[in-house]
């Protein structure tokens, strides 16, 4: 049999940790013949902590330079593995070192067999050592031999055997150091080979494998075809439907939900109660993000089902062929697949970009923070050079603590900022996906109209249904979101209550244990003060009491850790099983609803099914979550209380029996001892009652907090607020849309799509507002803290200039800089621990409200800008054409005047030229009037049809079976009329919107007709101008200068286009009138040379005179407007009418935020820059059979005749 020895040697730096020492740490393997267990010592840094009246914690090397270590060397030379353990204490020579007294060393030896030890062993697995005094620079060590039998531990077991050292130094408090010591058992089994057994096993295994191989081959051949065909069908079906219900059938989403729910068990069973609320807040953010993703997936699925349902209804009504429906359905599926791929790629790009940007920002701010710290340390070092070494060490320690807090604050700020950036990226992708879904639908409808697969009337009806259903979808999603927000708020409010409950239980447990242990020490001290014990006896009893108390607490910690670990696994398994079952049930129901959309006849019915299903699912899931959370808390709390009560009972038993017997052995009077025990029993009962009362009070505060949270996120209030906001925005967008003068069908379609896009992003996501609130609160707290830091720095720089507090003594002017620096640093550290002012929360709420209002206003502004831009572009195109036409008429007038004055043409010849165009002008005017009359008659017929439809359907809404003998006939009719009033109003509003849309479309059609007619007229005028320029022998350069004067705003390209048109028309005119005119000779060219030069100045003068006349008229008009009485300005702009700006839940209670309304009519008062927004109460809509009067436009043909008449006269 061989013995192996494994050795690992660690040489840690001596100056970085308290675990460094003068001798090398060695790790040997315990070995035994068979089975063989190997024990490894895992070395870790010594942690330092204080107990009792603690002033601060130590980390790394202790403040007074004391080093405490527990080390071992393993030996394998004996039958059972053994180790030589050494406890080492070194009081090193440092500037802050001091002599140590009353050293008490407590060593955990649970599971070990101790040999050759000088310590006092207890029955609970501890041994104690004492030393009266340890001088600076001295050290002492304790050694003993321990063995571990293989049957005492199992493979993989870990033994935690720390040692503790407490002592008294120059500090008024006792200091306690802890040296961790870990043993891990590994079992190595050596198997002795048996060749006969191996041969028999090989034969049996060979025969069994042969039989199984033939059986598998037989079944593979038998079912190969069936399996192949079914697999092919499954792959095809999966390829077609992988996107249809992926959000509901995917196991990843369920697994993520289960993982998030498991974290609640981790939080409740955490060993650090102080970090529970922070972990719960992070869990809430992650859950809100997951809920946003689920809602977005639900919205996408509903939108796809709605599109398919609309196409099916269109096919069933005979307005769309089944072949076209299938083709459009296939195109929609393909577009949806491409959209999902595009979104995934965009998501990956955003994540990479955001990660790189956040890393760069982190490096920059970390470097900046490091430079500030180095500058502060250098500045402090200049001050510390002139002070004692002890003060310098204390000040440096404070500065390092402050810098650590600043770094932690910076890390949290960067993490919150990165979290906000990710949430905004998710929101942008969600908005992009919604808009792209609308874009896909509208694009396919336009394509179907263009290809002739869908009639315009059917497309118009389809778009109206789509718009109406989208309003219902947005209302449904608002309900889903409000319901989810309410249920999640309720869930995490309850969880916060549970966390506070378990923290209260932990506080109660620790309080009882501390009271019981303090009573044990107090019992001994009272006897010593009464004179029944001398100092040596008291020290021995105190040592034993401290050993027993530490043993009980250590056992409690170990039992809690082990039992919580077992219970944690049990709770996770139970929770996952029930949650997975609930998710499967709800997923089947969701799939059934999605499949039923193909059989649904009405979209409202389909949306109603979704509403009921989601409400039921949310309530059931939250009920299950709450029940599981409460059950987990009850079990964990019962476990904690049972173990703590057991530990407390052991401490009482130790006091009443063990310590009592020891005191009685030393001759303590029984009556005195009994009196003290009864007093302690009463104090412990009173302490327990007081802790229970505090726990009840905290529980009541938690209940009130949960109620207030549910009140803030009430489902009905949130839904009503969102509905009111959408109604308000609907009024604004309707008002903006009605302001359009003319729109084509395509432009109207684009405007509808843009309105849908605006309404699609009017909701509030679940996670982003909360994340944004955390970022704002962190930012405001940072600003507040920096302002306080600035005050402290100013006070340190010039302390005599700062006002003194009445509660404090005035600082002495002779106080040194080091005292001021220490005081300033301590105050800054305290600021990190203090709570920020409560008004910052209200400030955050106000900022969130302002940002939301700005977002809504930005949507309104963008829509109004696009609408105004569209109208301006149309007006600009018409204006450019009018300018060109007017310039052409001006040039014609000049040419005719010069031809007449130069006697090149007689007056009758000019009349003949003008009259030659009169038949063509009259024909154009007749055609235009016929087209206008036809379109207006068509619109009147549509208005009549709409009125007849409303007259037939509107009163029918009120027609119900009546009771002939009813005594309340009138009241019944009125009640029915009131109940149906909303439907009538909606129907009337819909008909009014349709009438307005028809009006603007008709106006655009008439404008196009007039434009076409005007283009034809413009072509004729070009021919006439070309002919006149031919007669006057006008050079091209002169004509270009004339056009430049007449069209000063025209570009060179536009001028060249007019010149080319004049030249081309001149050629056409010369061909048509070949022989009618005689070519001018060189003498006539010289004759006209003189007035060619004066022509430009004459045209410029006429244009200047016209401009002056227009300016004069505009000035008089402005003066007449300013003379009118204007209403006074108001501080807040109010939209007149029954409704005003809706109240938002985040609105601050201190002051109202003025909300300007985009798209209002603004009037400049007295040219001072002040704006008066005027809103008029809309009159009640009236049903009219007449076509709305069109704006009177100037007839260009009549204007042309008048211009000619004026020119001839």
UniProtKB/Swiss-Prot annotation:
Key word Protein transport present: no
Topology in the lipid bilayer: Single-pass type I membrane protein
Transmembrane segments: 201-221
A biological process from GO: smoothened signaling pathway
Basic and acidic residues bias (residue ranges): 689-700
Membrane-side (Extracellular) residue stretches: 1-200
A Gene Ontology cellular-component term: ciliary membrane
Pfam families named in the record: EVC2_like
Location relative to the cell: Cell membrane; Cytoplasm, Cytoskeleton, Cilium basal body; Cell projection, Cilium; Cell projection, Cilium membrane
Residue positions the entry lists as glycosylated: 120
Disease the record associates with this protein: Defects in EVC2 are the cause of bovine chondrodysplastic dwarfism (BCD). BCD is an autosomal recessive disorder characterized by short limbs, joint abnormalities and ateliosis.
Complexes and interactors: Component of the EvC complex composed of EFCAB7, IQCE, EVC2 and EVC; built from two subcomplexes, EVC2:EVC and EFCAB7:IQCE. Interacts with EVC. Interacts (via N-terminal end) with EFCAB7. Interacts (via N-terminal end) with IQCE.
Function: Component of the EvC complex that positively regulates ciliary Hedgehog (Hh) signaling. Plays a critical role in bone formation and skeletal development. May be involved in early embryonic morphogenesis.
Listed name of the protein: Limbin
Gene that specifies this protein: EVC2
């Amino acid at each position: 049999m061989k013995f192996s020895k494994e050795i690992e040697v660690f040489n840690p730096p001596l100056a970085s940790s308290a675990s460094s020492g003068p001798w090398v740490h060695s790790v040997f393997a315990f070995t035994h013949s068979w089975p063989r267990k190997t024990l490894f010592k895992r070395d870790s840094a010594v942690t330092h902590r204080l107990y009792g009246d603690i002033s601060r914690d130590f980390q790394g090397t202790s403040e007074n330079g004391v080093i405490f270590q527990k080390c071992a060397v393993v030996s394998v030379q004996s039958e059972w593995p053994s180790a030589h353990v050494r406890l080492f204490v070194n009081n090193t020579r440092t500037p802050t070192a001091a002599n140590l007294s009353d050293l008490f060393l407590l060593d955990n030896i649970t599971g070990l067999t101790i040999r050759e030890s000088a310590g006092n062993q207890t029955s609970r697995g501890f041994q104690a050592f004492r030393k009266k005094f340890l001088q600076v620079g001295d050290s002492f060590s304790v050694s003993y031999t321990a063995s571990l039998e293989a049957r005492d531990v199992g493979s993989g077991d870990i033994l935690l055997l720390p040692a503790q050292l407490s002592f008294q130094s120059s500090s008024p408090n006792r200091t306690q150091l802890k040296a961790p010591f870990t043993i891990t058992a590994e079992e190595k089994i050596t198997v002795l080979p048996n060749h006969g057994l191996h041969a028999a096993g090989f034969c049996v295994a060979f025969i069994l494998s042969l039989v199984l191989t033939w059986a598998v081959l037989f079944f593979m051949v038998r079912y190969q075809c069936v399996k192949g065909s079914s697999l092919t069908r499954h792959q095809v079906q999966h390829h077609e439907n992988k996107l249809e219900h992926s959000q509901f059938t995917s196991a990843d989403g369920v697994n993520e939900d289960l993982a998030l729910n498991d974290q609640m068990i981790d939080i409740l069973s955490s060993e650090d109660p102080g970090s529970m609320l922070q972990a719960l807040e992070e869990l809430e953010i992650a859950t809100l993000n997951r809920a946003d993703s689920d809602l977005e997936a639900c919205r996408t699925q509903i939108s796809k089902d709605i599109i398919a349902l609309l196409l099916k209804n269109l096919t069933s009504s005979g307005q769309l062929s089944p072949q076209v429906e299938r083709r459009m359905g296939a195109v929609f599926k393909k577009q949806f697949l491409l959209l999902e791929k595009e979104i995934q790629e965009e998501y990956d790009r955003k994540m990479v970009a955001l990660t790189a940007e956040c890393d760069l920002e982190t490096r920059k701010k970390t470097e900046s923070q490091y430079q500030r710290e180095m500058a502060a340390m250098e500045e402090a070092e200049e001050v510390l050079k002139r002070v004692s070494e002890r003060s310098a060490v204390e000040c440096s320690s404070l500065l390092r603590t402050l810098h650590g807090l600043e770094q932690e604050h910076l890390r949290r700020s960067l993490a919150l900022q990165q979290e906000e950036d990710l949430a905004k990226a998710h929101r942008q992708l969600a908005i992009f996906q919604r808009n792209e879904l609308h874009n896909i639908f509208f694009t396919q409808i336009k394509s179907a109209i263009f290809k002739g697969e869908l009639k315009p009337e059917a497309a118009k009806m389809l778009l109206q249904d789509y718009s109406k259903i989208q309003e219902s979808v947005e209302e449904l999603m608002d309900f889903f979101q409000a319901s989810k927000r309410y249920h999640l708020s309720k869930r995490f409010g309850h969880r916060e209550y549970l966390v506070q409950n378990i923290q209260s239980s932990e506080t109660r447990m620790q309080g009882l244990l501390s009271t019981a242990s303090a009573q044990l020490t107090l019992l001994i001290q009272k006897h010593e003060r009464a004179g029944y014990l001398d100092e040596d006896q008291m020290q021995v009893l105190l040592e034993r009491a401290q050993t027993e108390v530490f043993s009980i607490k250590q056992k409690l910690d170990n039992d809690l850790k082990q039992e919580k670990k077992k219970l944690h696994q049990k709770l996770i398994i139970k929770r996952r099983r029930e949650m997975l079952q609930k998710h499967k049930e709800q997923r089947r129901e969701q799939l059934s609803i999605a499949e039923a959309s193909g059989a649904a006849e009405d979209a409202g019915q389909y949306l109603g099914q979704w509403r009921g299903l989601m409400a039921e699912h949310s309530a059931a899931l939250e009920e299950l979550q709450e029940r599981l959370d409460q059950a987990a808390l009850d079990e964990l709390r019962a476990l904690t209380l049972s173990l703590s009560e057991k530990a407390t009972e052991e401490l009482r038993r130790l006091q009443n029996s063990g310590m009592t017997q020891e005191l009685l052995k030393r001759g303590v009077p029984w009556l005195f001892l009994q009196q003290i025990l009864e007093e302690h029993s009463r104090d412990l009962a009173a302490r327990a009652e007081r802790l229970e009362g505090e726990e009840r009070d905290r529980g009541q505060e938690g209940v009130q907090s949960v109620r207030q949270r549910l009140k803030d996120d009430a489902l009905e209030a949130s839904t009503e607020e969102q509905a009111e906001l959408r109604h308000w925005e609907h009024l604004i967008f309707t008002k903006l849309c009605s302001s359009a003068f003319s729109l084509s069908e395509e432009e109207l379609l684009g405007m509808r799509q843009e309105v849908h896009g605006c309404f699609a992003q009017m909701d509030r996501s679940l996670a982003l507002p909360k994340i944004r609130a955390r970022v704002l609160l962190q930012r405001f707290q940072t600003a507040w803290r920096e302002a306080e830091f600035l005050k402290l720095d100013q006070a340190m720089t010039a302390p005599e200039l700062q006002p003194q507090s009445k509660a404090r003594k005035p600082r002495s002017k002779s106080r040194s800089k080091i005292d001021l620096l220490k005081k300033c640093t301590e105050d800054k550290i305290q600021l990190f621990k203090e709570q920020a002012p409560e008004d910052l929360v209200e400030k955050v709420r106000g900022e969130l409200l302002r940002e939301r209002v700005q977002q809504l206003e930005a949507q309104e502004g963008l829509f109004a800008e696009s609408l105004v831009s569209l109208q301006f572009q149309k007006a600009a195109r018409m204006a450019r054409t009018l300018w060109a036409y007017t310039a052409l008429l001006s040039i014609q007038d000049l040419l005719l005047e010069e031809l007449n004055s130069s006697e090149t043409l007689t007056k009758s010849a000019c009349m003949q030229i003008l009259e030659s165009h009169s038949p063509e002008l009259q024909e154009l005017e007749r055609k235009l009037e016929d087209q206008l009359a036809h379109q207006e008659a068509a619109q009147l017929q549509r208005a009549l049809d709409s009125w007849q439809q409303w007259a037939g359907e509107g009163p029918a809404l009120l027609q119900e079976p009546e009771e002939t003998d009813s005594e309340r006939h009138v009241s019944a009719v009125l009640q029915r009329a009131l109940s149906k009033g909303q439907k009538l109003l909606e129907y009337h509003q819909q008909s009014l919107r349709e009438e307005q849309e028809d009006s603007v479309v008709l106006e655009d059609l008439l404008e196009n007709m007039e434009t076409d007619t005007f283009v034809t007229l413009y072509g004729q005028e070009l021919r006439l101008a070309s002919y006149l320029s031919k007669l006057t022998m006008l050079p091209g350069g002169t004509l270009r200068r004339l056009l430049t004067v007449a069209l000063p705003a025209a570009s060179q390209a536009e001028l060249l286009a007019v010149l080319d048109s004049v030249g081309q028309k001149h050629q056409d005119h010369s061909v048509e009138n070949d022989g009618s005119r005689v070519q001018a000779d060189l003498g006539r060219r010289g004759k006209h040379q003189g007035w060619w030069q004066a022509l430009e100045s004459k045209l410029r003068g006429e244009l200047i005179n016209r401009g002056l006349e227009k300016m004069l008229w505009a000035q008089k008009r402005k003066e007449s407007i300013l003379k009118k009485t204007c209403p006074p300005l108001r501080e807040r702009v109010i939209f007149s009418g029954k409704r005003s700006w809706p109240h938002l839940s985040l609105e601050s209670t201190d002051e109202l935020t003025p909300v300007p309304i985009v798209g209002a009519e603004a009037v400049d008062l007295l040219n001072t820059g002040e704006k008066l927004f005027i809103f008029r109460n809309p009159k009640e809509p009236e049903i009219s059979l007449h076509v709305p009067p069109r704006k009177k436009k100037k007839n260009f043909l009549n204007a042309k005749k008048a211009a000619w008449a004026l020119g001839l006269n």
